[in-house]
């Protein structure tokens, strides 16, 4: 299967190219990046595009894939609402897999967090803490947002009504039902996430630590193979994994 990697010069892109070249089922049709020495376009016989680049790069790239009928896998995070609308429009014409995290472990965690939130209820305060390397550009991480949304789902509340991003100053006592997200940055951390359920007499913590970008790249390559031949629509990594 011929795949194109968008953002091929980046941390994730380099890992994707390396793993795709090692796979007997995949062929790298194009390594696309704005960096010098990289391609700007994929060939017409490309069978899937995997995008781990920059939020503003996604709309023009996915629009081109939609015109050509090529499935698209989005790993890039931090999309604005307008950019997300462009993705949704493309998904009416091609299969699109979009996930803030392609690792098996985090996708399992999403289900565990939903169950925990439902079981423990709003008496347990939910705080999501994430840490990433100092080069990460968006905050909080797409994964932290997905985890916080899973907690909101488990409680049956609308995430936007209860979300809080960090705290500073005289914020007052913590109201019940809030779901707060905190982003730490430093060093070379690949991606750590903890969801805390803090009760009055006990605390439950669910943690995932990615040790290598291989965890994300393997999932994205699997998603590209899964997407080929699907009906147009927007899918998540949970669909790919059947979770
Ligand atoms: N979903 C996941 O599992 C997952 C995992 C890790 C990272 N990410 C996300 O993937 C993205 C990339 O992460 P990274 O750590 O590899 O970043 P990075 O900065 O190392 O790489 C991004 C690459 O994209 C390139 N790029 C920028 N604009 C472009 C354009 N218009 N066309 C083509 N290429 C362009 C840059 O030149 C760079 O080489 C980020 O949004 C990050 O949050 C997602």
What residues fall within each predicted segment?
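Rossmann-fold dehydrogenase core element
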Residues: 71, 86-103, 121-126
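Short acidic/histidine-rich motifs immediately flanking catalytic phosphotransfer sites
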Residues: 42-50, 66-72
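C-terminal substrate-binding/catalytic lobe of Rossmann-fold NAD(P)-dependent oxidoreductases
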Residues: 2-44, 122-243
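Short glycine-/small-residue-rich Rossmann-like dinucleotide-binding loops
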Residues: 53-54, 77, 183-185
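Short, acidic/turn-prone active-site loops that include or flank metal/cofactor-
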Residues: 34-36, 77-80, 101-102
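Rossmann-fold NAD(P)-binding glycine/threonine-rich loop
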Residues: 63, 67, 76-96, 107, ...
